[in-house]
From Swiss-Prot:
It catalyses: a plastoquinone + NADH + (n+1) H(+)(in) = a plastoquinol + NAD(+) + n H(+)(out); a plastoquinone + NADPH + (n+1) H(+)(in) = a plastoquinol + NADP(+) + n H(+)(out). SUPFAM superfamilies: HydB/Nqo4-like. The gene is ndhH. This is NAD(P)H-quinone oxidoreductase subunit H, chloroplastic. It is found in: Plastid, Chloroplast thylakoid membrane. It is an enzyme of class 7 (translocase).
Length: 393
């Protein structure tokens, strides 16, 4: 009698592309030995739209609506980096009031991004309830955005030298009310999630990254701070008016998925502290630098000639980017979002290189999931927090 032999071939499984409402159009080719992950190969590019090349054929103001499609859950940060680069090239000063408004909008956007990370992350590991809770607070933030900018998601609010419009009457009081309410919401999340034994079983000790390893991989944001590295560009680069406020860099030393969760939960509380201080200390004055208008090149345009005088026209403001290069970065919710800009005495950038945090943080995924269980892939991928719009650009 012949004994049947057991086949030991690896199983190759396609995970994704996922729906954009979850982790985006990311495809993972996973090699499995039973439930154990042997190899994982991410396939990118499904959402590539040529954002860098588009930037080289647009003025800064024309390009501003495009950038909100990178990380479409934290659009204030993509607008901020797009505006900060030409501001530094032209040495343009931002009024105090505008700087305070920017900080408020950035921190509200950080909270909204972390909330929409928390809900799907919990759904990935089997907890559906928080997915609905986070939308309650997120809608309140979007109501504030809509009142100030007119848009709930793609705001198009930042401008070179300031912001597009001042805060409407009563907005500051509504925002302060939201801050008081949201602090109780964070406490509720921590009671529900942080000490939940089922949650801890899924995330504790899963996807561990050491501090030196995180630096070598070029990780940033909560991925880096959860590995024991106290690095936050708001403290390091002193941009906008963050130095005027009292807040702490949130970090953990364990480096696992639980540590990354704790960092993001703590960051939401710190963002509320920053917003409250910015609202209470917001000065009067202009919300934009009116001197920027003297840099406008459209007054010399042929469209201002005699024969075009009866045509109604409202050109977008443009000015030349001087012939130099610089790298500008901000601390986005997912990590270091940077722009390498090269000017060429033209209204168009000669080179516009995007440094997306999600793309670089994603590179460590294959190493983290090796020798883990299949179910741990979604836990680790969720803890990285990626948006494919900025990964593929």
């Amino acid at each position: 009698m012949t004994v049947p032999s057991t086949r030991k071939d690896l199983i190759i499984v396609n995970m994704g592309p996922h729906h954009p409402s979850m982790h985006g159009v990311l495809r993972l080719i996973v090699s499995l030995d039973g439930e154990d992950v042997i190899d994982c190969e991410p396939i990118l590019g499904y959402l590539h739209r040529g954002m860098e090349k588009i930037a080289e054929n647009r003025t800064i103001i024309q390009y501003l609506p495009y950038v909100t499609r990178w990380d479409y859950l934290a659009t204030m940060f993509t607008e901020a980096i797009t505006i900060n680069a030409p501001e530094q090239l032209g040495n343009i000063q931002v009024p105090k009031r505008a700087s305070h408004i920017r900080v408020i909008m950035l921190e509200l956007s950080r909270i909204a991004s972390h909330l929409l990370w928390l809900g799907p992350f919990m759904a990935d590991i089997g907890a559906q309830t928080p997915f609905f809770y986070i939308f309650r607070e997120r809608e309140l933030i979007y109501d504030l955005f809509e009142a100030a900018t007119g848009m709930r998601m793609m705001h198009n609010y930042f401008r070179i030298g300031g912001v597009a419009a001042d805060l409407p009457h009563g907005w500051i009081d509504k925002c302060l009310d939201f801050c008081d309410y949201f602090l109780t919401g964070v406490v509720e999340y921590q009671k529900l999630i942080t000490r939940n034994p089922v949650f801890l079983e899924r995330v504790e000790g899963v996807g561990i990254i050491g501090g030196e390893e995180a630096i070598n991989w070029g990780l940033s944001g909560p991925m880096l701070r959860a590995s024991g590295i106290q690095w936050d560009l708001r403290k390091v680069d002193h941009y906008e008016c963050y130095d005027e406020f009292d807040w702490e860099v949130q970090w953990q030393k364990e480096g696992d998925s639980l540590a990354r969760y704790l960092v993001r939960i703590s960051e939401m509380t710190e963002s509320i502290k920053i917003i409250q201080q910015a609202l209470e200390g917001i000065p009067g004055g202009p919300y934009e630098n009116l001197e920027v208008r003297r840099l406008d090149r459209t007054k010399d345009s042929e469209w201002n000639d005699f024969e075009y005088r009866f045509i109604s026209k409202k050109p977008s403001p443009t000015f030349e980017l001087s012939k130099q290069e610089l790298y500008v970065r901000v601390e986005a919710p997912k990590g270091e979002l940077g722009i390498f800009l090269i000017g060429d005495q033209s209204v168009f950038p000669w080179r516009w290189k995007i440094r997306p945090p999600g793309f670089i943080n994603l590179q460590i995924l294959p190493q983290l999931v090796k020798r883990m269980k299949l179910a741990d892939i979604m836990t680790i991928l969720g803890s990285i927090d990626i948006i494919m719009g900025e990964v593929d650009r």
